[in-house]
Regions:
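A short, N-terminal "cap"/entry segment at the start of jelly-roll beta-barrel domains
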Residues: 1-50, 85
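Conserved short histidine dyad/triad with adjacent acidic residue
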Residues: 35-41, 49-68, 102, 123
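Glycine- and acidic-residue-biased ligand/ion/polar-headgroup-sensing regions
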Residues: 60, 70-87
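A short hydrophobic beta-strand segment most commonly corresponding to one strand
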Residues: 74, 112-123
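A cytosolic small-molecule/anion-sensing beta-strand core signal
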Residues: 78-79, 93-94, 112
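Structural motif
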Residues: 81, 105, 114-115
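Short acidic-glycine-tyrosine-enriched beta hairpin
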Residues: 87-103
Length: 123
């Protein structure tokens, strides 16, 4: 199973329990050539027919330009801080989370090197 970036999903679920060290996955992502040469890198930690949990690492200043999604989205900042814009603009820091409904225009900018978990329903 591959994620939307064409990469192999790390932990496709098949019924049952799975545990993942997010800290270890952040270290792994930051040790790749994609991280060294780019501004962000991501991998699906869990992906099945109903759910996608994406871990993304972003360098300071990295942006996800304004876009919309087909399903609600929750963004949990694991480390660092981001500027999240969806009508209003908020700084979301490590340990904080923001959620939006489907089809809401939004954008993200890393205020510092950051890691975020994006949780979306598959529709």
């Amino acid at each position: 199973m591959t994620d939307e970036h064409g990469k192999q999903a790390l932990r496709p679920t098949a019924g049952g329990m799975v545990t993942i060290s997010v800290a270890d996955e952040i270290v792994r992502l930051k040790s790749t050539p994609e991280w060294e040469s780019g501004i962000r890198h991501a991998v699906s930690l869990i992906k099945n027919a109903a759910l996608n949990i994406l871990l993304m690492v972003l360098k300071k200043g990295a942006r996800l330009h304004e876009h919309r999604t087909k399903s609600p989205v929750a963004v949990h900042v694991v480390s660092g801080s981001i500027r999240f814009s969806a009508g209003a603009e908020r700084i979301i820091s490590a340990g904080e989370m923001v959620g939006i409904d489907q089809n809401v225009a939004h954008s993200v900018e890393a205020m510092e090197e950051s890691a975020i978990l994006l949780v979306t329903a598959i529709v």
